[in-house]
Each structure stands twice: as C-alpha cells, then as structure tokens.
Amino acid sequence: MRLPTRHLLGIEGLHPRDISALLDLAESYVLLNRSGKTRRDVLRGRTLINLFFEDSTRTRTSFELAGKRLGADVINMSVSTSSVSKGETLLDTAATLNAMNCDLLVVRHKASGAPALLAQKVDAAVINAGDGMHEHPTQALLDALTIRRNKGTLAGLTVAICGDIAHSRVARSNLLLLTAMGSRVRVVGPPTLIPSGIDQFGATVFHDMREGLRDADIVMALRLQTERMSAGLIPSAREFFTFYGLDAAKLAMAKPDALVMHPGPMNRGVEIDSQVADDATRSVIREQVEMGVAIRMAVLDVLARTALAHA
C-alpha cells in the first residue's frame, strides 16, 4: 500500500481504506514481533531520526524499536544537548537535518503545526509524533488496532473518551479516526475541559461521568495535561478524581465486557484508579504499548514505499 502523501502529519486526510490497510499491515507485524523475528530488509540503508522537543517514553522508544526491527539506522537526537538549546530555530534545524540526507524524520513538538512546517522544508518523510494540542496520529492508529483486535471491528462501537479533552492531541486524533471508521464517540469531562464545537466533529458531549459511560464498549481515560493548562480549570486533582476519575463504580455503568484504555503516562488516583488500570480482564493498557511498536513499523514501512513512488 501507499499513502496519498509521503508524510503522516495527522489522521485528518487519511481515507478509511488507508486506515484499514495500515491496521492490516500492523497485524502482520504483531505476529512477527511475537515470533522474535525481524524484517531488516525493509529499511536497510535508510536513516531514521527521532527529533523530540518534548519528553517521551513510549512513543520515542517504540519508533526506535520499529526502525531497528526493520533494519534502519536510527538516531535519537537529544534536543537538550543540540544546537536548539543554543537558540537555533526550527527551520535552521530542519535545514541542517536536510543536509544530512536522512530518509525518515519523526517529530514531536510543543507547537501545533511544527511537523507540517518541517515537512515543507525537508526531503525526508515526516511523521508527526505529537504536536501541541493538534494531533498524535500513530497513537490513534495503535488504539484502533488494539480495539479491533479485541472487538473484531470499530464500526458500531461506543467509545467514551474521558478527562482532559481540551488539551489532548490524542483525543482529537482518536475522534477523527473512530468516527471515520464508524464508531460512536462520546467525550466526557467537566465543561472547562471540553472544547466548544467538538460536537461538530461527531462527538456527543457528557459532563456526567456515569451517564457518559453508560453501555460504552470502550472507555479511554486521558491524563490532565497540566503543562498546557491555565490555572483554575479544575478545583483540585482530588476533586477531579471524585467526579471524573475512572474507578470500579463508574466503570460498572459501561458494558460488562467494556475495555479500559489509556495512552499513558498514567496518573493513578487522578484520572484512573489502580484497580481499574491493572484489571487483567478489562484493561488493555499494556497491549496498547505492544501495538504501538507494530503500528509504527507499519507506518515506517508504508512511508518508505510511498517515498519511492514519489521519487
């Protein structure tokens, strides 16, 4: 398969058939990873640079693993020790990296639109690994893969996304993907953390947690993005947990076989209770991490093929 463009900057613009094809390819990489084998021929001779302007554990590490398992030369660029810390602009950094002739550039940045700007300035294929409050496409893809593997489909499912919706790029990308694939999406949280107009994107808004979770197939908890918040949006973390923290009592409103998800990192006792997070029968949080490697292998594979087609 090939994507419409040589970059992956967001879910917006991806056709449902592209999403399905990426998920299908990722399925094959799940099996490959579990077998302990690699496909080092896929990206042999290609260079992948991870350029992260924000902290990351799961995303950066899984892209590194994905690249190495496909045979790429992977470079993790430390922004804190790079020329960026000395005042170099994003565009100058882009020009420098472009001169090095890398093939794949994975970018995380606090500013919405930064990966799209880089994509205009470099010859490499650019993958958005999270930009501000805008999008996090590979997170939505791995979430979709996790859901599909457990439920068999995305169409017709009711997915409740709970917590800090306003500041979450994960919520936006999931909303775009899930509605495109036929899921019914609810967003649940206090009025201060639900962006106005989100219903125009196909979401149903709930401010009562129990009502929002009623008969849901999937419950996705999101952390409070305190680094992006202004003061006064919530009274306290303790009060937030009382009304919007995912615990066993609130989860009981969902379907008996509802799955619990969280993109990480988790703040236990704030947006999710440990009992729920660690419930082996319902929580697929660790499976999400595993699916992250497979979906990123699929994305790197497809973008490498797409780049050849656009060459």
UniProtKB/Swiss-Prot annotation:
Family matches, as Gene3D superfamilies: Aspartate/ornithine carbamoyltransferase (3.40.50.1370)
InterPro entries hit by this protein: Asp/Orn_carbamoyltranf_P-bd (IPR006132), Asp/Orn_carbamoylTrfase (IPR006130), Asp/Orn_carbamoylTrfase_sf (IPR036901), Asp_carbamoyltransf (IPR002082), Asp_carbamoyltransf_Asp/Orn-bd (IPR006131)
Residues that bind L-aspartate: 86, 169, 223
One GO-annotated biological process of the protein: 'de novo' pyrimidine nucleobase biosynthetic process
Record EC number: 2.1.3.2
Pathway membership, UniProt: Pyrimidine metabolism; UMP biosynthesis via de novo pathway; (S)-dihydroorotate from bicarbonate: step 2/3
Binding site for carbamoyl phosphate: 58-59, 108, 136, 139, 264-265
Recorded catalytic activity of this chain's protein: carbamoyl phosphate + L-aspartate = N-carbamoyl-L-aspartate + phosphate + H(+)
SUPFAM superfamilies found in the cross-reference section: Aspartate/ornithine carbamoyltransferase
One Pfam family named in its UniProt record: OTCace
Alphabetized UniProt keyword annotations: Pyrimidine biosynthesis, Transferase
Record-level Gene Ontology MF annotations: amino acid binding; aspartate carbamoyltransferase activity
GO cellular component, as recorded: cytosol
Cysteine disulfide links: none
Annotated transmembrane regions: none
EC class (word): transferase
Similarity section: Belongs to the aspartate/ornithine carbamoyltransferase superfamily. ATCase family.
Record's function text: Catalyzes the condensation of carbamoyl phosphate and aspartate to form carbamoyl aspartate and inorganic phosphate, the committed step in the de novo pyrimidine nucleotide biosynthesis pathway.
Subunit organization: Heterododecamer (2C3:3R2) of six catalytic PyrB chains organized as two trimers (C3), and six regulatory PyrI chains organized as three dimers (R2).
Designated name of the protein: Aspartate carbamoyltransferase catalytic subunit
Annotated gene: pyrB
